[in-house]
């Protein structure tokens, strides 16, 4: 091992050692960077809106140094302690081609999934897959929208026109007594957007943290071990 290789390895090891689990409201999100690739530009173009009917608002899950959110215990009201981060929120994106079309996955992290006091679990990840005919076109079209719901998907092919605002799909985060835990679904209600960070725009430390951190009952949908499987499950045909 030469000196340069040793120094790089040492720096990476130090970054991993320094990364920690921190308070959910201490995680600083990534500012949305300038999109430079076709995939990144598509991510920005089709960035969805999320409406919160009940429960936590989305929070950043990881910071640039690889520190991850410790989440919240499922105590208090469904939104207790998680009505929004003072640092701002985050949506995570990743793109794949699948059966000749494009799948853009947008993922949100929530500190807890607690429909009522004492029920639920620490951490929640939800996502929506927006299906686009060809992101290289000047005027691409949304073919389908697949919001995540209880380890599966609500698939809309084609989506109702009033659930799309321009190029932005509108999704709702809510729970009910019937299914207990929170999920996403399409909605006609306008929502909020967050700064987008694409998978390839994350720092190495942040990406490694999302790959390796144990979020308990919640799974990071866009990490390598989950991404393509979930895209396949979200397919509309």
Curated annotation (Swiss-Prot):
Indicate where this protein is primarily found: secreted
Localisation = Secreted
Outcome, altering residue 82 to S: Impair elicitor activity
Domain of life from the UniProt record? Eukaryota
Gene Ontology BP, a term: effector-mediated activation of plant hypersensitive response by symbiont
Q: Which InterPro entries match?
A: NPP1
Where is the motif Conserved heptapetpide motif annotated in this sequence?
120-126
Q: Which Pfam families match?
A: NPP1
Give the keywords, sorted.
Glycoprotein, Secreted, Signal, Virulence
**Which sites carry carbohydrate?**
67
List membrane-spanning regions: none
Indicate yes or no for the key word Transport: no
> Where is the secretion signal located?
1-19
What would be one Gene Ontology cellular-component term for the protein?
Answer: host extracellular space
KW Phosphoprotein (keyword) present = no
Query: Motif span (Conserved undecapeptide motif)?
Result: 103-113
- Family to which the UniProt record says this protein belongs: Belongs to the Necrosis inducing protein (NPP1) family.
| Written domain comment of the UniProt record | The structure of NLP effectors is remarkably conserved with a high level of conservation of a central region containing the conserved undecapeptide motif AIMYAWYFPKD and heptapeptide motif GHRHDWE.
* Free-text function comment from the UniProt entry: Secreted effector that acts as a pathogen-associated molecular pattern (PAMP) recognized by the plant immune system. Induces necrotic cell death and ethylene biosynthesis in parsley. Stimulates early induced host cellular responses implicated in elicitor signal transmission such as increased levels of cytoplasmic calcium, production of reactive oxygen species (ROS), and MAP kinase activation.
The molecule here is called Necrosis-inducing protein NPP1
Its gene? NPP1
């Amino acid at each position: 091992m030469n000196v340069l290789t040793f120094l790089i390895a040492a720096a990476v090891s130090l970054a991993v050692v320094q990364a920690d689990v921190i308070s959910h409201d201490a995680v600083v999100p990534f500012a949305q960077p300038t999109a430079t690739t076709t995939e990144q530009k598509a991510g920005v173009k089709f960035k969805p809106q999320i409406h919160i009917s009940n429960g936590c608002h989305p929070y950043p899950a990881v910071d640039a140094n690889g520190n991850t959110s410790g989440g919240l215990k499922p105590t208090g009201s469904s939104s207790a302690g998680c009505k929004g981060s003072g640092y701002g929120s985050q949506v995570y994106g990743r793109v794949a081609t699948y059966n000749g079309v494009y799948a853009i996955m947008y993922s949100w992290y929530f500190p807890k999934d607690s429909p009522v006091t004492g029920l639920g679990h620490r951490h929640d990840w939800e996502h929506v897959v927006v299906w686009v005919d060809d992101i290289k076109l000047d005027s691409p079209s949304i073919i389908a929208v697949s919001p995540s719901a209880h380890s599966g998907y609500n698939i809309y092919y084609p989506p109702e026109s009033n659930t799309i605002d321009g190029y932005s799909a509108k999704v709702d985060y809510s729970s009910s007594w019937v299914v207990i835990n929170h999920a996403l679904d399409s909605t006609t209600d306008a929502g909020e957007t967050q700064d987008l960070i694409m998978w390839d725009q994350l720092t190495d430390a942040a990406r490694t943290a999302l790959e390796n951190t144990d979020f308990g009952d919640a799974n990071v949908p866009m990490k390598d071990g989950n991404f393509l499987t979930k895209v396949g499950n979200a397919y509309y045909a």
